[in-house]
UniProtKB/Swiss-Prot annotation:
The keyword ATP-binding applies. It is an enzyme of class 2 (transferase). It comes from the Bacteria. This is Phosphoglycerate kinase. GO terms for biological process: gluconeogenesis; glycolytic process. It catalyses: (2R)-3-phosphoglycerate + ATP = (2R)-3-phospho-glyceroyl phosphate + ADP. Substrate binds at D21, L22, N23, R36, H59, L60, G61, R62, R113, R146. GO terms for cellular component: cytosol. Keywords: ATP-binding, Cytoplasm, Glycolysis, Kinase, Nucleotide-binding, Transferase. It is found in: Cytoplasm. InterPro entries: Phosphoglycerate_kinase, Phosphoglycerate_kinase_CS, Phosphoglycerate_kinase_N, Phosphoglycerate_kinase_sf. ATP binds at K197, E319, G345, G346, D347, T348.
């Protein structure tokens, strides 16, 4: 991939426009989770250290295009950056026709989704953004799967378009995990529905040695193996698909192991009583909410011996502690493993936080949808744009 990297460019005196993913939760005008802001700081600081006049843009939430809405303003982000950066930081509400920004300063643009044409990747809008800078830096992996004016179009028209350190690091880590993985390679794919992760499962089943399924997805595979799943969430219409995926994996010498024991309850609630059962004894009224300790231990052994682990999705309803032991054991196994591990997706990151293993995972992906599309083997529009500009 011939992508220019911001780290390699001379930026002294240059106007640098950085697209970050600063889409953070805000309550009463204050940022409540700053993970994405923290992740963006090294890129912004590097641009300042290189002597640039820095402009930063992002979306926040889902406002109606063409309308200012204070609820989705970037002001709380500006307040945060003012404390985090040792330089002047200001908010530009009107910026498309020009911005005053000096070397050593940071100007944050108001929410890009307030602009009509942002989501449709409007060319006129993209050209206006491109005219503001000498160098455009795409650093938002979380939105790299969307072809929008601030993530794609602007890069086609800017004098120079490059990847920021966060995006470059993300692509390098994903490439290491997927393009040339240390074997055995294990992928853990959780989530509620096979249908939403079908392309991921298909793509990974041709690459990995063991494909571990969890959550509602696993229930469909349990049913495909001929077991009762009671009232559990599963997709009867995808049982044949599940059988095909298992057969494909096994024909390559791999497998998609099905749980041998499960944790069930008769209702979905924080106070539901958890009961451990052999997978062959699930009753008509049971709902499967987690894998049992024997299954968890078997998976932990697979992870322990892995060379590469890709984790996307919990194996149980870990939000309720009585259904969290399976995911906890998986998390511990990843933490203890010598494998190169990469974790991505909102629920996965919540599990990483809950079980305190963030510093034991080799790479934590900032992208949800983009992470999934990369796993599916899809081309990400923003990455394709950077490749074309890097020629």
């Amino acid at each position: 991939m011939a992508i220019l990297n911001m780290q390699d460019l001379e930026l002294q005196g240059k106007r640098v426009l950085i697209r970050e993913d600063l889409n953070v939760p805000v309550k009463d005008g204050v940022v409540t989770s700053d993970a994405r802001l923290r992740a963006s700081l090294p890129t912004i600081k590097l641009a300042l250290e290189k002597g640039a006049a820095v402009m930063v843009m992002s979306h926040l939430g889902r406002p109606t295009e063409g309308e200012f809405n204070a609820e989705f303003s970037m002001q709380p982000v500006v307040d945060y950056l003012t404390k985090a950066l040792d330089c002047p930081v200001s908010l530009a509400t009107e910026y498309l026709d020009g911005v005053e920004v000096a070397v050593g300063e940071v100007v944050v643009f108001e929410n890009v989704r307030f602009n009509v044409g942002e989501k449709k990747n409007d060319e006129a809008l993209a050209k206006k953004m491109a005219a503001l800078c000498d160098v455009y830096v795409m650093d938002a992996f979380g939105t790299a799967h969307r072809a929008q004016a601030s993530t794609h179009g602007v890069g086609l028209h800017a004098p120079i378009a490059c990847a920021g350190p966060l995006l470059a690091g993300e692509l390098a880590a994903l490439g290491k995990a997927l393009d040339n993985p240390a074997r055995p390679m294990v992928a853990i794919v959780g989530g509620s529905k096979v249908s939403t992760k079908l392309t991921v499962l298909e793509s990974l089943s041709t690459k990995v040695d063991q494909l571990v399924v969890g959550g509602g997805i696993a229930n469909t595979f349990v049913a495909a193996a001929g077991h009762q799943v009671g009232k559990s969430l599963y997709e009867a219409d995808l049982i044949e698909e599940a059988k095909r995926l298992v057969a494909n994996a096994q024909s390559r010498g791999g497998d998609i192991p099905v749980p041998t024991d499960v944790v069930v309850a008769s209702e979905f609630s924080p106070t539901a009583t958890a009961t451990l059962k052999d997978v062959s004894t699930v009753s008509d009224t049971d709902m499967i909410f987690d894998i049992g300790p024997d299954s968890a231990e078997a998976l932990a052994e697979i992870i322990k011996n892995a060379g590469t682990v890709v984790w996307n999705g919990p194996v149980g309803v870990f939000e309720f502690d009585q259904f969290g032991e399976g995911t906890k054991r998986i998390a511990q196994a990843i933490a203890e493993s010598n494998a190169f591990s990469i974790a991505g997706g909102g629920d996965t990151l919540a599990a990483v936080d809950k079980y305190g293993i963030a510093d034991k995972v080799s790479y934590i992906s900032t992208g949800g949808g983009a992470f999934l599309e990369f796993l599916e083997g899809k081309e990400l529009p923003a990455v394709a744009m950077l490749e074309s500009r890097g020629q």
